[in-house]
Amino acid sequence: CLKKRQLGTLDCKTAFLTGRKHDRDIYCRPPKDGLPGVAPGSLLKIVKGAYGLREAPRLWYLKARDTLLDAGFEEMQTARACFVLHDRKESEPVNVGMLVLHVDDACYAGEGPMFEKAMEHIRSKFTIGKEEHGEFTFLGRRVKQNSDFSVEIDQHDYVKALERVVVARERRQQSTSPLTSKELHDY
């Protein structure tokens, strides 16, 4: 149970660029504007994930998972990208923390020296951008932890930002008709 534990979120900057190395050879040319210190016409070898490569998200995830495992977390078998940290010094393991990973964003809750040490390990391995506690946005949801440690989650800002879609009365009556090309483009 994660009662009375501070919630937090963090963002790993340039996540795809810190993923595992590729297991194949990938080459590219520098941009037309050039790169400092790279001769025009050079051929560059990409050794790690890069934005746009199909395996970049997987390479990042594997690196992040390895780092969390090294920090002492265990990946839940029933919910991949959900990690728990147990103190196994007692006869029964005691849950001291949890972390959920979604691409380069993490939401976590935990307490105590073991949890803090694990989080410091994670912070030492990645460039952390924004890290917030108490009230923050995670995956488009506003998360607010109250002083009694209860948690409120809503999507008020997301709903307010939605654009109203006006559908003509005659079109509403054709609810089983396929979308027109204009409708596909507009919505």
Predicted features, each with a name:
Residues 1-187:
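Long, low-complexity, charge-biased intrinsically disordered regions
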